[in-house]
A protein has these predicted regions:
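Coupling/switch/interface segments within P-loop NTPase motor domains and analogous charged loops
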Residues: 3-31, 129-134, 139-145, 149-493, ...
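Switch/communication elements of ASCE P-loop NTPase nucleotide-binding domains
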Residues: 13-15, 32-34, 39-110, 476-623
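Beta-strand elements of modular eukaryotic interaction domains
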Residues: 78-81, 126-129, 243-245, 499
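Short secondary-structure boundary/capping segments
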Residues: 107-108, 118, 152-157, 239, ...
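Short, flexible/disordered secondary-structure transition segments
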Residues: 115-119, 266, 522-526, 566, ...
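Short alpha-helical segments and helix-capping/turn motifs at coil-helix boundaries
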Residues: 117, 124, 237-242, 580-581
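C-terminal alpha-helical "lid" subdomain
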Residues: 622, 626-637
Length: 637
């Protein structure tokens, strides 16, 4: 049997070992699912909204017996959707409580995250805010064991199976508690017993910060009393802190798309989608599959553009333009920090700063190295390097050693954190070898096929990891061109820019690319000392927005297909939770995995026909509570 300790550090002095877990036998099937949400009676009305003080059961993995959640011995749907995948849904009319129930999940995860991350370095990530007056429980199943997270006002309890529960405290005796979870325990616990949640909600009304600012919150800083911790949190919405990933996916939830005060930037979202889609579309083409039915990739064109890099130096980090524009490597005897970084990457020999492309690549390496050192908890020991505006300072011996160790650590890191560094190094090496013609790359659009021939050194790029590795660096703009097919025949005379696709088609691309991007990033984290989640919870709120019924009909099958084709479920377990008004989506989900809501209450499914593979009209009538039939109200009258 395997035992491990979950420790709490008290005021950074004492380690109190208060918890151990017993692993299941190796033969236990890998599984993960969210099973029950329980709203407790003293939960604030502002938080539960129209929900009731009751249990909400998401699937048939658990039973509620005498106000207690009990795990069934067998999972009747084990393997139903494929290895290590579970799909479940919440349905109900508008106002029935679907999104409110999701928000309870987000708050529970947020509060636990506040306590787990307390004392951890998250320099470029937003502060987390602990939600007060939350009394709710979240039950989930991991590999045959029932886990419980209970938010009980100023404390959070966690229990796995029949073992003793762990209590983490936000406020104790009127003061912000100084308890801190050790990083080593956090890492092990996250991998084995917790999950990462990726949320999408493209509704214009969703995630508006102003809707949450009335909720009482705390900022958990040592030395503050309860009142001061609440005062310092005033004006902040806890939800705003969950849009960022700049802590290396340590905080176990991310909301999409990114919103600033409730507003999301469509142009920025589109730009991110182009970057995420590039590797996915190339992968699909190489494996003779279509990422999207009726469309094939025609080409991806890259155009050199150094303006965004200049903005980072000059506008974000306040480097004077004359310093940025005139920078060249310093003499050998008196290196500056930028030069030392380039030396440690081994790119100085033959580097020509008068060559625009080489100079841009070198300046990007300097920028990105500073960014990694200052952004990610795994690189905390290198934060003393300082900010980017110090890159021209002379190197002292201590800094020289720090830079050398930093670069070596980045070079060993094969996760998403160092990906853009690796892409830039491949590009720079190709430039120096002469396989890239600078003039052509400066003045022309470059096809992705042509680019790969220049940089991949003859490798057959077929895996998603390899394709991502050899994509162009961030100082290239991306243009994706598609071909459209009907009955197997191409119908477009000229390639179709992705911007000319319909709103529904682009929404389809945005949604799928978001999930694939984040999951691949999570799975790229391999180092044992970093937080690695291997249970992944995908929440899709009103996923059918902009989708034609045919897209809705195919949605679940397509999502399952991507998970399997990219082998994501080989090393991770997935729970897919969908709030929907679509009978087509519901027809792919067995009744045991559906929570029916009406007026904030769970409706028992007795008398409701199982929607799996059922007639759409039957599903509309019974599962979506269409009490007035299927005819428009004006016509009915």
């Amino acid at each position: 049997m395997l035992y491990w300790l979950f420790s709490i550090e008290i005021m950074n002095i004492n380690h109190v070992d208060i918890f151990y877990m017993e692993s299941k036998e190796k033969t236990t099937p890998k599984e993960f699912s969210l099973s029950v949400i329980h709203i407790l009676h003293n939960c604030s009305p502002h938080l539960k909204k129209g929900l009731r003080d009751e249990f909400y059961k998401l699937n048939g993995r658990c039973e509620i017996y005498r106000n207690k959640v009990e795990l069934r011995e067998e999972n009747p749907l084990q393997g139903f959707y494929g290895s290590r995948i579970n799909v479940e849904a919440i349905v109900g009319v508008n106002g029935s409580g679907k999104s409110s129930l999701f928000e309870i999940i987000y708050r529970v995860i947020n509060n636990l995250s506040c306590l787990l991350n307390r004392g951890k370095r998250r320099k470029t990530a937003d502060d987390l805010y602990y939600v007060k007056d939350l009394y709710s429980e979240l039950y989930y199943v991991v590999n045959g064991q029932l886990a419980r997270i209970s938010c009980l006002g100023n404390k959070v309890e966690f229990q796995m199976g029949n073992e003793a529960s762990v209590t983490l405290t936000a406020v104790k005796d009127g003061m912000v508690s100084s308890e801190k979870v050790l990083m080593a325990d956090f890492v092990k616990w996250a991998k084995e017993n917790f999950f990462y949640t990726i949320v999408t909600n493209y509704s214009l009304q969703a995630f508006n910060a102003n809707d949450y600012k009335r909720e009482r919150c705390l900022i958990l800083k040592d030395g503050l009393d309860d009142a001061m911790a609440e005062t310092q949190a005033e004006g902040h919405a806890w939800m705003d802190s969950l849009f960022h990933k700049n802590d290396g996916y340590m905080t176990p939830i991310v909301l999409n798309p990114y919103r600033d005060e409730g507003v999301f930037d469509l142009n920025k979202e589109h730009h991110l989608t182009l970057y995420r889609l590039s590797a996915i579309l190339i992968y699909a083409q190489k494996h003779y599959r279509r990422f999207m039915e009726d469309y094939d990739l025609n080409d991806i064109l890259y155009t050199f553009d150094a303006s965004s890099l200049k903005k980072k130096y000059v506008e974000k980090y306040q480097v004077k333009f004359i310093v940025y524009d005139g920078y060249k490597c310093s003499p050998l005897e008196h290196n500056d920090i930028g030069t030392e970084i380039l030396k440690c990457y081994g790119v100085m020999d033959g580097l020509i700063f008068d060559d625009t492309l080489q100079r841009t690549a070198a300046m990007y390496l300097i920028y990105k190295t500073f960014a990694i050192a200052n952004s990610y908890p795994a690189y905390e020991e290198f934060s003393s390097l300082g900010e980017l505006d110090k890159f021209t300072q002379e190197v002292v011996p201590e800094t020289m050693d720090l830079i050398c160790r930093l670069v070596k650590t980045i070079m060993r890191d094969k996760s998403h954190i160092s990906l853009k560094i690796r892409q830039t190094l491949h590009f720079l090496n190709a430039l120096k070898k002469g396989t890239i013609d600078s003039q052509t790359f400066l003045t022309s659009k470059i096809s992705h096929r042509e680019y790969f021939l220049c940089v991949n050194e003859g490798k057959d790029l077929r895996s998603m990891r390899d394709i991502q590795e050899y994509l162009p660096p961030s100082f290239f703009q991306i243009e994706i061109l598609m071909n459209r097919f009907e009955n197997g025949e191409r119908v477009n005379d000229t390639p179709i820019p992705i911007e000319q696709m319909s709103a529904g088609e682009r929404q389809y691309l945005y949604t799928f690319s978001t999930y694939i991007y984040h999951v691949l990033n999570l799975l790229s984290i391999q180092e044992s000392h970093r937080v690695r989640y291997r249970n992944i919870n995908l929440i899709l709120d009103e996923v059918e927005i902009c989708f034609h019924p045919e897209f809705q009909r195919r949605f679940v099958n397509e999502l399952l297909g991507y998970i399997k084709r990219l082998f994501m479920n080989r090393n991770a377990s997935f729970n897919i939770l969908i709030a929907t008004h679509s009978p087509f989506i519901l027809s792919d989900i067995p009744q045991s995995n559906i929570l029916y809501l009406e007026d904030g209450k769970m409706v028992m499914p007795e008398g409701i026909k199982n929607p799996f593979a059922a007639n759409i009209c039957d599903i509309l009538y019974q599962s979506f509570f269409l009490k007035q039939g299927f005819v428009g109200e004006f016509a009915r009258k």
